[in-house]
């Protein structure tokens, strides 16, 4: 296995092979990663410039791609856009039984409300999402959005402390510090280099 340090090299290879499926997977992976560590300038153009509507996806793929684009909107501080898009995305997820994507979108929407200072709306959505996630222990979607939801989550936890919420707050704090280190080094985890092999 040869590791390529520059993702653009692999991207050009996919383009030369006319392998659009792999190119879209590659772009969506990098879009989500860079959105999570809040480096929107590095997000691939398909997502950064919000051109998903120009790509033909099979219907089952669409909610996940839209969820990734929501994360990009959050990283670009386009909070009202997240809220507006979620109004149509959540019913679509429910219709197709995409509970995990729906959970992510609920949390992203709560994050957008929190960033706009609408803490009541954020709290309602987070409490609903916590209720859905707790039985299965789905921590990561909350941790990934910790920076946006930490204040609202802390206020929920101060009223009714739960071990599940305590874990989110603890992991979220560590995650936030890790993201800051990554973005300050302008780097990416070695594991993503496997996508370039």
Predicted segment positions?
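A broadly conserved detector of short glycine/acidic/proline-rich loop/turn motifs that flank catalytic sites
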Residues: 32, 71, 172-175
């Amino acid at each position: 296995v040869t590791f390529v340090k520059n993702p653009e090299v692999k991207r050009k290879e996919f383009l030369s092979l006319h392998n659009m499926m792999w190119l879209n997977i590659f772009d969506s992976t990098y879009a989500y990663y860079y959105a999570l560590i809040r480096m929107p300038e590095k997000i691939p153009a398909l997502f950064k410039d919000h051109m998903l509507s120009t790509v033909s996806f099979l219907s089952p793929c669409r909610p996940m791609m839209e969820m990734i684009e929501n994360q990009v909107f959050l990283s670009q501080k386009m909070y009202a856009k997240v809220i507006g898009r979620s109004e149509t995305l959540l019913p679509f997820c429910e219709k197709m039984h995409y509970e995990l994507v729906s959970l992510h979108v609920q949390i992203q929407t709560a994050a957008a409300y929190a960033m706009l200072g609408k803490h009541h709306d954020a709290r309602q959505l987070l409490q609903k999402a916590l209720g859905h996630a707790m039985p299965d222990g789905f921590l990561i979607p909350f941790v990934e959005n910790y920076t946006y939801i930490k204040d609202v989550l802390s206020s929920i936890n101060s009223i009714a402390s739960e071990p599940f919420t305590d874990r989110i707050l603890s992991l979220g704090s560590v995650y936030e510090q890790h993201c800051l280190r990554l973005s300050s080094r302008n780097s990416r985890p070695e594991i993503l280099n496997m996508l370039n092999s």
